[in-house]
Amino acid sequence: MNALSALSTEVRQYLLVTGNYWAFTLTDGALRMLVVLHFHTLGYTPLQIAALFLFYEIFGVITNLVGGYLGARLGLNRTMNIGLGLQVIALLMLAVPAAWLTLPWVMGAQALSGIAKDLNKMSAKSSIKLLVPGSQQGTLYRWVAILTGSKNALKGVGFFLGGALLALLGFKGAVVAMAAVLALIWLGSLVMLKKDLGKAKAKPKFRDILSKSRAINILSAARLFLFGARDVWFVVALPVYLSTVFGWDFWLVGGFLATWIIGYGIVQSLAPAITGKQRGHVPDGRAAFVWAGLLAMLPAAIAVGLAGGWSAKVVLLGGLILFGVLFAVNSSLHSYLIVSYAKEDGVSLDVGFYYMSNALGRLLGTLLSGWLYQAYGIGTCLWVSMLFLLLAAVIACALPRHSASHVNCT
C-alpha cells in the first residue's frame, strides 16, 4: 500500500483503469467460451451459436458511436462504471433457470455485454490520453501498447477460464461467480476512479459524434479494413477449416485459438520495441502504411501455398503465427495513433468514432467470412483479406507523417 501511495495520481489512475479493463476482459473472454461450450452441449448448431453473438457485434458499432458522446458529456469514470455494471447484469441474465435461456433471451444478454464491452474499452483507451502529458509521446505509445496487448492476452486466458469454470461450477455457477467478483470490482471503481475524468469543458452536441478531424477520419477508414481483413478469414473460415479439414475437435480448435490470442496480445505489448521506440521513434502515417503493406503479403502467401498443394498444416499454421505477429504490431500502432490524434478536450468523441469503425470492420469481416467460406472456400477469404489490407495501406498513406518521413504512395 505504501508503494502504491507513493505513485503519482496519474499512475494510480492508470493502474485502476487498467485493472478495471483487465477484470472486464477476463469475464468477456470467459463468457464467450461459456456460451459456446454450453449451448454446443445443448445441441445448438454452429449457425445458431453464431447468431447468439450477432447483437454483441451490432451493438458494438452503435455503442462506440454514441459512447464517445456520453463519455465527453458525463465523464469517462461514469461510462467505464456503467460498462462494468452492465456486464454484471448481463452475467446475471444468464443465471436464470434453463427454461428461460431461449435464443432471444441469450441474444439480449449478449447485446448488453457488447454494449458493456465497448463502453469499457472506449473509456480505458480515452483515459490514457488524459493521464500522459502531450509532450511524452513515447510514454503514451508504451502505455497504449501495454493496455491493448494485455487486454488481448487476458481475453485468451479468459477462454481457458470459461472452460475451467464450466467444468468446475457448471454454467449457472460460473456466471454467478463471475458476476460476484466483477460486482466487487465495480463497487471499488465507483469509489476510487477520478470524478469527471474525460468530461469535455464545452458540452458537445450530438452531431459531434462524427469526427471533424481529417487524420481521424482517414485512420478510422484504415482501421475498418484492417480488422475486416483479419475477421474475413479468422472468425468463421479458420475455425471451420481447422475442424473439417484438419479433423480437430472443438477443444483443440478453441485451445489453439486462445493460445494464438494470448501470443498476439504479448506481441502487441512489445510493439513499441519492434517499431523502434527504443531508438526514439514513435509511429506516424508512414509506419502505418509500411506495416499494413507487409501484412498484406501474408494472406496472399498462405492462399498460394494452399492452392499449390503444399502441406496445409505447415502453410496455414505457420502463416497464422506470422500473421498474428504482424497484425499485433499494426493494431498496437493504430491504437497509439488514435489516442495521439484525439483532441484532449472530449477525447472520447474521437476515440469512440474510431472504434465504431473498428467494430464495423469486425462486423463486415464476420459476415463475409461465413458467406465467402461457404460459397468459395478459405482461399477466397484469404484473397479478400489481402485486398482489405492493401486498402488499409493505401488509405494510411494520407495520414500525417513526421517531417523527416517520406513515402511515395503513387
Which role does the model predict for each range below?
Residues W22, A90, T102-N120, K313-V329:
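Hydrophobic core of transmembrane alpha-helices in multi-pass small-molecule transporters
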Residues L7-I58, N217-W260:
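Helix-loop boundary and gating motifs at the non-cytosolic
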Residues V61-A98:
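Conserved MFS/SLC helix-loop-helix module at the cytosolic interface between two early adjacent transmembrane helices
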Residues G85-W100, G293-G309:
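C-terminal ends and interior cores of transmembrane alpha-helices
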Residues A180-K199, I395-L399:
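C-terminal membrane-cytosol helix-exit motif in multi-pass small-molecule transporters
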Residues A51-Y69, A258-A271:
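Central cavity-lining transmembrane alpha-helices of secondary-active solute carriers
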Residues T63-L76, L166, V267-G285, Y373:
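Helix-to-loop junctions at the C-terminal end of transmembrane segments
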Residues A109-K151:
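Cytoplasmic helix-loop-helix junction between adjacent transmembrane helices
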